[in-house]
């Protein structure tokens, strides 16, 4: 005994050492590991506390997992999907009542599955899905009542199935038909209901060779007339006790016949005329029979009288749906004999059953509430007999998804209302836009009328001013009043005009010297062009130097010419065509009524070119230079005639030379006209008469006057020499040969416009220096008149510069005298 005790101890120590060498389990499971952490076996049986779910701390390389004798209630796909190498799974003796469809789909290597002694009620196709290599399936000692015909379709390699000790009443003929490798099928200890519906399975079972030979334990339990019958008869009296032979003899196309001896015995509780099945044949007696009455074989064979009866099948409970709502249902249950058995309505959910209500009426309506849409609910009529539940009929209800509420469909009246509202809004917008357009158009017309009225008033006012200014000079018989102006230089010189007594006779008048009583002159041409108001100078751009200042002043002349271009053409043509007789005059004072421009004549070279006059500050130095054009021929220049934009009476002037100015030979001299005769009478042909006569003639010269001039560089001014000594007012008079000076020390250079100044904004009168912003219609007009006017103004300016460039000395003098009067008119 002592040796045996020591041997047992050594075995336990060796087992413990082996388990520790293989690796101790994580948690409460014992693991047997291999190389590189590979786990062969995990024993998690009889855990304390017992597992209620499959543990997840086990290595996913496990091959054999044993979880028997725990409290696992369900098998989920998520708990088994990580064990891809699992081959053997033992879940025996748990509380499993629900297996998720496809729970074993990740165990494609599983060969042995033990689910015995659990609480499964149904066996469906989804529970065994994916077990293509499964060979041994143990489902004994469960609560299985229904085995679907397609339950084993995905397990073609099954060899052994154990469905014993369950509650199976019916099996289909095709339940095991596809299992070609099946050798053992244990179905004993099930309460089979022997009827013609079981005949197909009985035929398969008779053809199947079961290796275990447990036919004596497979019996019918119901109906009571066939209780105790074996599914397959064996032994001495097996043929008579086999339900297969009995059903084959009585079942034809859904009905069956039975062997009866004597009148049929009524079955208690099922005594309905025409509906009770025939009773089973009586048990054979052991009494010996007479020799002449005994048939061959063992024992006495009773005489059996075969009678064919019209069998009546037993009425079974029925269920149908009466009404379905979004969360409830009403079912109708009909019971053939509610008092023969105890019927209840059971709900099956995940292999679990719940009693809904007891059925005590032949026909009842049961309302089922708190249901969910898109969920299958299974209800069965169950009867209890000898502690066993029998399913008579089942019904599956699935509440459909409630239809989505239809969107608001506008009625025809509403749609019409919307359409009319939209059309009304559009029509209203059209009316508003039309009204706005009408108002703006009316306002534009009013503005145009106002502009025309203002332009007419301005023209009338200008004409009135001209008449008021020059009218007395034309009509007065005597001397016209003189306009006061600033004195020029140290001595004031004036030119006093005399008007003729009669228009028919041309008389000679002598010029008297007025230097003894100095008078303020109206201003010479230089002052007229440079004596600008302060506000006009502020509106112009700042001038970087004197050459640009001279360019700007020449530009102002070009700007004014565009408005009176036709008048200039007529005037120039008239002045060029008139025949004037010039008489020598004594150099002396100039008229104070009009500003005088003194011109310089110098010897002509072989080639002449027109240059703009240059004004200088000093007396007698750097005076105004006048170069004649190429067409001009050398000769004595004529005296200038003054035209101020209005028709003047013909008049004569007498010039008296008061002194002689001596300058160096290289200096430029200003000579208007000199003659040894002391007095010279200047006769001027009336310009207005010639203007009217030569109006048509002027159009012939339009083309060459509108040609654009070339660019000529301005001649730089000469440095001013020191001013000479002058006498007082009572001394020597200012000679006409001396250049007129400006009262302010500022040089002005009149030069031709270069192309870079052609786009300058300029004008020669204050009212055109700063223009008001155009109105809204002028800004929005597609083809504005401003571009056209600017083009005409530029063309007119170029035409004037062309005329000035090619004009001869007397024509140039007439143009400058004319603009002297126009500038004086604007200044006034």
Swiss-Prot record:
Leader sequence segment: 1-25
Origin species: Mus musculus
The answer to keyword Cell membrane applying to this record is no
Quaternary assembly: Interacts with PPP1CA.
Record's compositionally biased regions (Low complexity): 638-652
Enumerate the InterPro entries for this protein.
Answer: Cys-rich_flank_reg_C, ELFN_Fn3, Leu-rich_rpt, Leu-rich_rpt_typical-subtyp, LRR_dom_sf, LRR_TM_domain-containing
Provide the Fibronectin type-III domain boundaries.
312-399
GO BP annotations listed = chemical synaptic transmission; establishment of protein localization; synapse assembly; synapse organization; synaptic membrane adhesion; synaptic signaling; visual perception
The annotated regions of Pro residues compositional bias extend over: 275-285, 714-725
**Which residue stretches does the UniProt record annotate as biased composition, category Basic and acidic residues?**
697-706
Q: So where does this one cross the membrane?
A: 419-439
Record-linked PANTHER family: ANTIGEN BSP, PUTATIVE-RELATED (PTHR24369), PROTEIN PHOSPHATASE 1 REGULATORY SUBUNIT 29-RELATED (PTHR24369:SF204)
**UniProt-listed SUPFAM superfamilies:** L domain-like (SSF52058)
Note the segments forming the LRR repeats.
Answer: 61-82, 85-106, 109-130, 133-154, 157-178
Protein's name according to its UniProt entry: Protein ELFN1
Task: List the Extracellular topological domains.
Answer: 26-418
How this chain sits in the membrane, per its record, is: Single-pass type I membrane protein
Q: Where is the LRRCT domain?
A: 190-253
| Function statement | Postsynaptic protein that regulates circuit dynamics in the central nervous system by modulating the temporal dynamics of interneuron recruitment. Specifically present in excitatory synapses onto oriens-lacunosum molecular (OLM) interneurons and acts as a regulator of presynaptic release probability to direct the formation of highly facilitating pyramidal-OLM synapses. Inhibits phosphatase activity of protein phosphatase 1 (PP1) complexes.
Where is the stretch described as Disordered?
258-293, 627-674, 697-731
Q: Which residues carry this modification: Phosphoserine?
A: 460, 646
Topology feature Cytoplasmic, residues: 440-828
